[in-house]
From Swiss-Prot:
Sequence ranges of Polar residues compositional bias: 633-642, 664-678, 744-763, 841-858, 867-876
Residue ranges crossing the lipid bilayer per the database entry: none
Disulfide bonds: none
Region: Disordered, residue numbers: 633-937, 964-1071, 1099-1125
Biased composition (Low complexity): 680-698, 705-726, 775-824, 877-937, 964-1012, 1023-1053, 1060-1071
Membership in a protein family: Belongs to the protein kinase superfamily. Ser/Thr protein kinase family.
Name assigned to this protein: Probable inactive serine/threonine-protein kinase scy2
Species annotation: Dictyostelium discoideum (Social amoeba)
Gene Ontology molecular function: any one: ATP binding
Protein residues bound to ATP: V36, G37, Q38, D39, K40, F41, W42, K43, I44, K64
InterPro entries: ARM-like, ARM-type_fold, CIK-Related_Protein, Kinase-like_dom_sf, Prot_kinase_dom
Length: 1125
């Protein structure tokens, strides 16, 4: 009983131990993984050594698979395998497979470990051919599977691999003194770093003895049947226990003579090159030839095979260098050469092949050699295929990244390959972890920072968000305070894409202080400029509170410290960005106070000024729109409903009674003004003004081009409103848009939307003297047909009307009217006719245009917009029915042509000595005068406008004009009629021999209505020639009077216009009736000077209406001998 129990217990223990033995691996030091390859006898496992936790490949021979083999053959196989393992253990060379764990033998296994192996060359060749034949994707997710699939056997890769095999073979021949005798795809191993290693050293023998060290195993003793029965021709067989090399790769001398030479291994190399290049897809050789080996026999099969190989090599010599090599190595053994010559051949001397070979042996190179190599590699790295870069070059570079001496030349190559051929996942898993320690260094080298900043866009694209925040952001912030100015500038120039990853706290705490320090810390101007551009870049992502509290004060600090042009330009761009970010109120309070002084800086150029003004206008428009909306909404809820007020002055009613009454009395005039036109009369002081001063409505001529900027309003104590500052639209805009001051354009106003305002207009009273008798048979002062002359000239309105009676020359002037003539003035009867002005002054009324009967001077000084015109203007009448031949410097005849040119088309009669009565010309003793600018004509206070009129003789009046061409303005000028006034030195010398009136005015523009224009006797005031000048434009009628020979000239000019308040001269001429008796006043202004030629000629100098005024004589040519008086 007890014996039975003990037996059962032993059986249980024995069964347990047996089952455990089948589970536990007999190889105790390694963890086996998948099989990566299989030799004739060896299985190659991927494994990990337990003691060191290092990856390796384990070669395992399982004895149980050969239990059926005879004991003697099994012993021969085991002896052969031990020889191969021990030979590998004894040899150490980069091109020979390295053993990391020596061979061990147990009852069941023989194993040894080597460096990690991807596969044998035969396995890779089989994978490639299978992949080409298959239509199914056999890709693997593992790195090893990817490399196997990606192995394409391109020629550059083939050259590098063959060279490594030759290098190992040379080591065997010269150092180990061995012949390999078994070179084939089975004996070549590809490691995981894609290096080609030489193995299969079981058939090696001494070069001297040519015998294998294994006893009873000589290749010469092998018989042919062993290849046939054992299947040694390349395909495995059940009789795989026979130890034979591959027949296809044996040299011909062994097959025919059973001997090996020192260069016999070169034949095997040639045959290997043929298989990997020409016969890669198994199209060069007959695929059924190997199956005929038993039938043909070894010799016949081998001869047929070698003949096909040589023929295909010869046929492909023009296509590849590999075919040329095959023709040499597979030919006559006497022409094959030796191993050393082949290694030094041109087949391996191209730059790309040598580069790959250098990288394969990089561990044996010195640092100085590596520095030179990697510097040159950057220039040629992109010549390699993407596969070569990823699989052969990049891993070597990453393995050397820990070398601080060469890191700065390694990193550019890594970045170059990563940017072009590395996937995002591979970069995050392989590349970035390898270089992260370098990037996160506390004291990185400037070269490393420069490389990272240069490749920052690529890094942002391939890194994850977490990697960007942990690695890249600290690098950029540190580079802003970088070790050198070059790094700082490079950071500011290239790191802008990373700005979108800055959060609000980082911007306010880290970025803005750094940028401000760069702007005010004494750095070069190019760094300061880039720093300001960063402010512009960050504005859209900064909160308004940070802008107001931090950014704007820093910008003011920057502007106070530097105002160079490039800095100003960058600041303008920043303020422009701020104008799009902030609201109108913040812009008005914070941005405009900085921009307006910036626009006046002397360092900015024209384009910069335009940019500044554009920003200012945009800000003003934004602020205006917001403010208008705010006030409109406020008014909508707070203002009562507007009612009509009896005292409302939005309507102007002016009545004009055109009768023939010769009395001048205040008369109401009916006018209609647009909505936006408002006038507030202002009382001015005039010593010679009547008690009730008149007012004149003066619209501005139309403009053909948009003004460059809005008019600037001038502040004055007496001005309460400005009609031209209101927003106009439609036809009303013609009031402020004008191409020329003397335009004759008349627009037709709309018949609706009319407003009227009651304005008291007072006309001057007539002096209590007897009026002369005036004929009422004169033609109308203005033609009924409107003529529009929009030239670059000052278009004078001229009516050439012939009359036998005297006529009056009536004008509106921007001053109080005063008649100091001894003879009173009688206004002629007027007719209502269309106005012919430089712009339409129709205020929406359906009535006919009204023409006032008397001269009205407006007392309302208006603000000063800058009106501009592009042409010179002529004062006076250029149209003359009489042929006036004025032989002066620029004598031009204008015969019934309305030509007012920019140049010298004037009737110049400036220095004639024949009874010439000359008005004093405008002049300026300062830099301000009449100027020709860009559509601007204004009166500015600031300086007086003296007149230099020097009488050299009683017949000569020299006119000297000083004109500036900076801005069209009359500066602080008071115009007055200094007739018979001793205070202004304006004296009419009636005692001159020929009655020449000498007008000498030093401080004011003066005109005379009393002066004797006769030649030896006073004028008979039966005919009035009234010359009215306005703003250097004369609107006159050239009427030819052939009956009345006496002339009385009355010049009504600007008077008592006090411009000290800097008010704009914008009063528009309402109805300017001009008429003068053969008075040709031609003022031609050509920038930058003005030539003013005043000509007074009598119509009755010649009965045939020919006036010949010559500078050289004092003769009047009277063809009909008519009496002047």
């Amino acid at each position: 009983m007890d014996t039975t129990k003990s037996f059962n217990f032993k059986e249980k223990v024995r069964g347990f131990l047996g089952s455990a033995a089948s589970v536990i691996s007999p190889i105790k030091d390694h963890d086996l993984k998948e099989v990566v390859g299989q030799d004739k006898f060896w299985k190659i496992y991927q494994s990990t050594k337990k003691t060191t936790n290092t990856e390796c490949s384990l070669f395992v021979f399982e004895k149980k698979l050969y239990e059926k083999v005879s004991k003697s053959n099994l012993e021969n196989v085991i002896t052969f395998l031990k020889k191969e393992a021990t030979t590998l253990q004894r040899l150490r060379h980069p091109s020979i497979l390295q053993v990391v764990s020596v061979m061990e033998e147990t009852k069941t296994h023989i194993h040894f470990a080597t460096e990690p192996i991807l596969a044998t060359l035969e396995d890779l060749l089989g994978y490639y051919r299978q992949r080409k034949k298959s239509t199914v994707d056999q890709s693997s997710q593992s790195e090893e599977g990817y490399k196997k699939k990606d192995f394409t056997f391109e020629e550059l890769e083939l050259k590098a691999g063959i060279f490594q095999i030759l290098d190992g073979l040379l080591f065997l021949n010269q150092t180990a003194k061995l012949l390999h005798r078994n070179i084939s795809p089975e004996s070549i191993f590809i490691t995981k770093d894609l290096k080609w290693k030489l193995g299969g050293l079981g058939f090696t023998c001494s070069i001297e003895t040519k015998e294998p060290p294994i006893s009873n195993l000589s290749l010469q003793d092998l018989r042919e049947y062993q290849y046939i029965s054992g299947g040694g021709g390349g395909e495995s067989s059940n009789n795989s226990n026979y130890i034979l090399p591959q027949l296809d790769y044996l040299a011909p001398e062994f097959i025919s003579q059973r001997k090996f030479e020192t260069n016999s291994d070169l034949f095997s190399i040639g045959r290997l090159i043929f298989e990997l290049s020409i016969n890669l897809e198994q199209k060069a050789l007959d695929s059924h030839l190997i199956s005929q080996l038993p039938k043909l026999g070894v010799i016949s099969y081998y001869n047929t095979m070698i003949e096909q190989v040589r023929r295909q090599s010869t046929m492909n010599t023009q296509r590849s260098d590999s075919a040329k090599v095959c023709t040499i190595l597979l030919g006559d053994p006497m022409l094959r050469g030796d191993l050393e010559n082949f290694i030094r051949s041109s087949f391996f001397q191209d730059v790309l092949t040598k580069t790959l070979l250098y990288l394969a042996n990089i561990s044996q190179k010195e640092d100085e050699s590596k520095l030179q190599f990697f510097r040159g590699l950057l220039r040629i790295v992109q010549q390699f295929s993407p596969r070569i870069q990823n699989n052969y070059i990049l891993p070597v570079l990453l393995s050397e990244i820990s070398n601080d001496r060469i890191i700065y030349v390694l990193l550019p190559n890594i970045m170059s390959i990563s940017a072009n051929h590395v996937k995002k996942e591979t970069f995050q898993s392989k590349v970035l972890p390898a270089i992260s320690n370098i990037l996160q260094s506390k004291e990185p080298k400037p070269e490393v920072l420069s490389c990272v900043l240069e490749n920052l866009p690529m890094l942002l694209q391939k890194c994850s968000l977490d990697q960007i925040k942990k690695i890249l952001l600290p690098i950029c912030l540190g580079s802003m305070c970088g070790p050198t100015n070059e790094i700082i500038f490079q950071c500011l120039s290239t790191a802008q894409p990373i700005a979108k990853f800055f959060d609000t706290d980082m911007i306010s705490v880290a970025v803005i202080p750094r940028l401000t320090n760069l702007c005010v810390g004494g750095f070069p101007v190019h760094i300061r400029t880039k720093a300001i551009q960063w402010f512009t870049l960050l504005v859209p992502s900064i909160e308004k509170k940070i802008i107001v509290d931090s950014l704007l004060p820093n910008l003011e600090k920057i502007l106070a410290g530097d105002n160079s042009p490039v800095i100003l330009q960058s600041l303008v761009e920043t303020y422009e960005a701020l104008s799009k970010k902030l609201g109108g109120e913040l812009l008005a309070k914070s941005v405009l106070p900085a921009l307006i002084p910036l626009s006046s800086d002397k360092h900015i150029d024209l384009e910069q000024f335009k940019t500044v003004m554009k920003v200012i206008r945009d800000i003003l428009n934004t602020y205006e729109q917001e403010r208008i909306n705010e006030l409109s909404n406020l008014q909508r809820y707070t203002s009562p409903t507007p009612t009509k007020d009896e005292n409302d002055t939005s309507f102007i009613t002016v009545n004009n009674n055109n009768n023939n009454n010769n009395n001048i009395s205040p008369t109401p005039i009916n006018l209609t003004l647009p909505n936006s036109f408002g006038i507030t009369p202002i009382t001015t002081t005039a010593t010679t003004q009547p008690s009730s001063s008149p007012s004149m409505l003066f619209p501005q001529p139309p403009q053909t081009s948009q003004p460059s900027s809005s008019p600037l309003s001038s502040s004055s104590s007496g001005t309460t409103s400005n009609p031209f500052n209101s927003v106009l639209s439609g036809n009303n805009k013609a009031l402020i848009d004008s191409p020329d001051f003397g335009s004759t354009y008349i627009s037709q106003p709309p018949s609706t939307q009319q407003l009227s305002s009651n304005i008291s207009l007072t006309l001057p009273k007539s002096p209590p003297t007897t009026r002369p008798t005036v004929s009422n048979s004169s033609n109308s002062l203005f033609p009924t047909t409107n003529t529009t002359n929009n030239n670059n000239n000052n278009n004078n309105i001229n009516n050439n009307n012939s009359s036998n009676n005297g006529s009056n020359y009536n004008s509106f002037n921007n001053s109080s009217f005063q008649n100091n003539s001894n003879q009173p003035v009688q206004p002629p009867p007027q007719q209502q006719q269309p106005l012919s002005f430089n712009s339409s002054f129709d205020f929406g009324s359906n009535l006919q245009p009204i023409k006032p009967t008397n001269t009205i001077a407006a007392q309302t000084p208006l603000p000063q917009p800058k009106l501009s015109y592009n042409s010179s203007f002529d004062i006076g009448n250029s149209n003359n029915n009489n042929n006036n031949n004025n032989n002066n410097n620029n004598n031009n005849n204008n015969n019934n042509n309305n030509n007012n040119n920019n140049n010298n088309n004037n009737n110049n009669n400036n220095n004639n000595n024949n009874n010439l009565n000359s008005f004093s010309n405008f002049g300026n003793n300062s830099s301000n005068g009449m100027n020709n600018s860009n559509n601007n004509f204004a009166l500015n206070s600031g300086s007086t406008l003296p007149i230099k009129s020097t009488s050299t003789s009683k017949y000569d009046i020299n006119l000297e004009d000083h004109v500036n061409s900076s801005s069209n303005s009359f500066s602080n000028n008071s115009f007055s009629n200094n007739n018979n006034s001793s205070s202004n030195n304006n004296t009419n010398n009636n005692n001159n021999n020929n009655g020449v009136g000498n007008f000498n005015s030093s401080n004011s523009f003066s005109s005379s209505s009393q002066s004797n224009y006769g030649f030896d006797q006073p004028l008979n005031p039966t005919t009035n020639s009234n010359h009215n000048s306005y703003g250097n434009n004369n609107y006159g009628n050239n009427s030819n009077n052939n009956n009345n020979n006496n002339t009385n000239s009355m010049n009504s000019s600007f008077k008592n216009m006090d411009l000290n308040q800097n008010n704009s001269y914008n009063n528009t001429l309402n109805d300017f009736n001009s008429f003068h008796n053969n008075v040709n006043s031609s003022f031609n202004m050509n920038p930058p000077s003005i030539t003013k030629n005043v000509n007074f000629n009598s119509n009755n100098y010649n009965n045939n209406n020919n006036n010949n005024n010559n500078n050289n004589n004092n003769n009047y040519n009277n063809n009909n001998n008519s009496n002047f008086w």
